[in-house]
Amino acid sequence: MNIAIRNPVATRPAERREEGSLQVALDPDLRIDTAKVFAVYGKGGIGKSTTSSNLSVAFSKLGKRVLQIGCDPKHDSTFTLTKRLAPTVIDALEAVKFHAEELRVEDFVVEGYNGVMCVEAGGPPAGTGCGGYVVGQTVKLLKEHHLLEETDVVVFDVLGDVVCGGFASPLQHADRALIVTANDFDSIFAMNRIVAAIHAKAKNYGVRLGGVIANRSAATDEIDRFNAAVGLRRLAHFQDLDVVRRSRLRKATLFEMESSPELDAVLAEYLALAEALWAGVEPLEAEPMRDRDLFEFLGFD
């Protein structure tokens, strides 16, 4: 693993912009100018980690240097890549009594399948502390040591549909936000709230919506209807296949599973998605619905 640590650079204090909420002004020297950065959001349990990990591998199959950052206290974003629960940033910081300058890259960065580099933020014990704070500190640490600059693609796999505080930190650094959803009420309802959060963050940061990834769904009719109504687009569609479940049990990515016609079609879809994202997808200016309007809009089979 050939990643150098440079001296940390301090960020500027928080300042209030004319629009949006209180934001932290990033030092221009800390901006990620050498990589394409994607933040993956979606309802809890929708398959963001599965999607993120296989997308990371797809990018690596295209010859890109990839860093996946798990932003969930469960620290299980990257285990199909690393074949284990990787050490977390918060554990590494605790080991050096939060003297970040004492950390080595190998203390919290693990190389996974096909060279994908993996980082897990970790978090406080269940029911205590603020997971959002931990994610914010992880992003700060990675930027201070310039680790994000050593890659072509950065994939943030973000906790559930929580888009406030530290869990919104990836939006400060992302070029495109991707939303994983299923063709059901709860997933689309959560997607609408995520659209609203990204819309607010886009006032002060460069992040823009990239599109929607349909997952665990035989059909996409409700997703497509919602997309048309608010100004989104579907980038890929992955059905609910048993090979996905088996890959998780084997602690493996889909790219490591035994070939079959249905799996080959899934892998082709991931590679096509990676190619499209690398080539660049047009930013979307989606307008979220009000909750009650969305409630009336969805359903009625």
From Swiss-Prot:
Keyword Iron-sulfur: yes
Keyword Kinase belongs to the record: no
Gene3D superfamilies, per the entry: P-loop containing nucleotide triphosphate hydrolases
GO terms of biological process kind: light-independent bacteriochlorophyll biosynthetic process; photosynthesis, dark reaction
Annotated [4Fe-4S] cluster binding sites: C130, C164
Binding residue positions for ATP: G45, I46, G47, K48, S49, T50, K74, N215, R216
GO MF annotations, alphabetized: 4 iron, 4 sulfur cluster binding; ATP binding; metal ion binding; oxidoreductase activity, acting on iron-sulfur proteins as donors; oxidoreductase activity, acting on the CH-CH group of donors, iron-sulfur protein as acceptor
Homology family: Belongs to the NifH/BchL/ChlL family.
PANTHER family in the record: LIGHT-INDEPENDENT PROTOCHLOROPHYLLIDE REDUCTASE IRON-SULFUR ATP-BINDING PROTEIN (PTHR42864:SF2)
Function: Component of the dark-operative protochlorophyllide reductase (DPOR) that uses Mg-ATP and reduced ferredoxin to reduce ring D of protochlorophyllide (Pchlide) to form chlorophyllide a (Chlide). This reaction is light-independent. The L component serves as a unique electron donor to the NB-component of the complex, and binds Mg-ATP.
Protein name per its UniProtKB record: Light-independent protochlorophyllide reductase iron-sulfur ATP-binding protein
Organism: Methylobacterium sp. (strain 4-46)
